[in-house]
Design a protein with these regions (language model features):
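Active-site phosphate-binding strand-loop segment of PLP-dependent enzymes
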Residues: 110, 121-176
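Conserved PLP-binding catalytic core of the aspartate aminotransferase-like
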Residues: 283-314
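Active-site C-terminal subdomain of aminotransferase-like
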Residues: 193-274, 288, 358-361
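Conserved active-site segment immediately N-terminal to the catalytic lysine
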Residues: 169, 183-194, 203
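N-terminal "arm"/small-domain region of PLP-dependent enzymes with the aminotransferase-like
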Residues: 1-40
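Conserved PLP-anchoring active-site segment centered on the Schiff-base-forming lysine
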Residues: 88-104
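PLP-dependent enzyme catalytic core of the Aspartate aminotransferase-like
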Residues: 1-4, 316, 329-361
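Conserved N-terminal alpha-helix of the aminotransferase class I/II PLP-enzyme fold
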Residues: 31-79, 86, 101, 109
Length: 361
């Protein structure tokens, strides 16, 4: 059966060449007579996988030795607790930018462990724009300022960043490796792997080493960045298979030219979709053009009564998971690194045919 195109927000499409390589190695990894899922995380073989994955990740993002790279359990949701537990005081203060659903989730969790100040918010306009950095009101007493560069549900992003008087913390779950970023502007970047890195269940943290060492006393050992760093991300048994696949994805990305190369593809994919939507009277996108995400493209049908028909017929055409989040409705095409450009082309062909078929309904 030919593979279909997955436009879901995550777990996302994996590069097919990576899946085939994993399939080939699944029963016998490097002649051991065992699957990589069966070998000890303490074995020399897995230590090699882990070290190579970190090395390739560092190469792709030009991460200096001033930063620790951690691979963790729990994805980004657990990081919503880990960040304040490790960087803020229980009676201290942290600043957060409220840009949408995931920013609000981060804020709600952080409020359990420190005092939160909202530095900026676009909730007054239903999150149709991203608060520009120049509008952020930062309290100098804050331990850090946190923002979510790409909001998957709303389909908006902030793609440029200047330096800040406060340490900058960013949830890069859905934007990591999609385009070049200047790591040196950040103090901590975290995210879940299931968009652009690999299977779900794995998280990543890139944190300045100078910030390690002062967690809140209540911080569980498994959520303590310092202990995770000292234990080389193996304080307990890590999600070994997801880590192994992540290493394969890093190798794949390097083989096609790295982050700059995939960014050109991503810009092209997104431009095709937005150009088509903007030139249509049948579809629309509500996000301020300068804040549009290159990873998640939400769109509405002029006739909402056709939503279910669109989903049924697109699924029959091999275009899966296009339903928008329940909080915003409509449709959403998530076009992460692993989704080939021909997937976007197939979606555009379907959207055009659907419009021609139902424009008079």
């Amino acid at each position: 059966m030919p593979r279909k195109f997955n436009f879901g927000a995550g777990p996302a499409t994996m590069p097919e060449s990576v899946l085939l390589e994993v399939q080939e190695e699944l029963l016998d990894w490097k002649g051991l007579g065992l699957s990589v899922m069966e070998i000890s995380h303490r074995s020399p073989e897995f230590i090699e996988i882990a070290k190579q994955a970190e090395s390739d990740f560092r190469d792709l993002l030009s991460i200096s030795e001033d930063f620790a790279v951690l691979f963790t359990h729990g994805g980004a949701t657990m990081q919503n607790a880990m960040v304040p537990l490790n960087l803020a005081k229980s009676d201290g203060l942290a600043s957060y930018v409220n840009s949408g659903h995931w920013a609000k989730r981060s804020i709600k969790e952080a409020e359990r462990y420190t005092n939160v100040r909202i530095a900026a918010s676009s909730e007054d306009d239903n999150f149709t724009y991203f608060p520009e950095q120049s509008s952020w009101s930062l309290d100098e007493e804050s331990s850090y300022v946190h923002y979510t560069p790409n909001e998957t549900i709303g389909g908006l992003c902030l793609r440029t960043l200047d330096s800040s008087p406060l340490p900058i913390v960013a949830d890069y779950s859905s934007g990591i490796l999609s385009e070049p970023i200047d790591i040196e502007k950040f103090s901590l970047i975290y995210g879940g792997a299931q968009k652009n890195i690999g299977p779900s269940g794995l998280g990543f943290v890139i944190v300045k080493k100078e910030l390690l060492g002062s967690p809140q006393p209540i911080t569980p050992n498994l959520l303590n960045y310092t202990l995770i760093h000292e234990g080389e991300s193996m304080s307990n048994t890590p999600p070994t298979f997801a880590w192994y696949v992540a290493g394969k994805v890093f190798k794949w990305l390097k083989s096609i030219g790295g982050v700059k190369a995939i960014a050109e593809i991503n810009y092209r994919k997104a431009k095709k979709l937005y150009d088509f939507i903007d030139n249509s009277d049948f579809y629309s996108n509500q996000i301020n053009p300068k804040n549009r995400s290159i990873m998640n493209v939400p769109f509405l049908l002029l006739n909402e009564n056709l939503n279910n028909v669109f989903l049924e017929e697109s699924s029959e055409a091999g275009l899966l998971a296009l339903k928008g989040h329940r909080s915003v409705g409509g449709m959403r095409a998530s076009i992460y690194n692993g989704l080939p450009e021909e997937g976007v082309d197939a979606l555009l062909n379907f959207m055009e045919a659907f419009e021609n078929k139902y424009s008079n309904v």
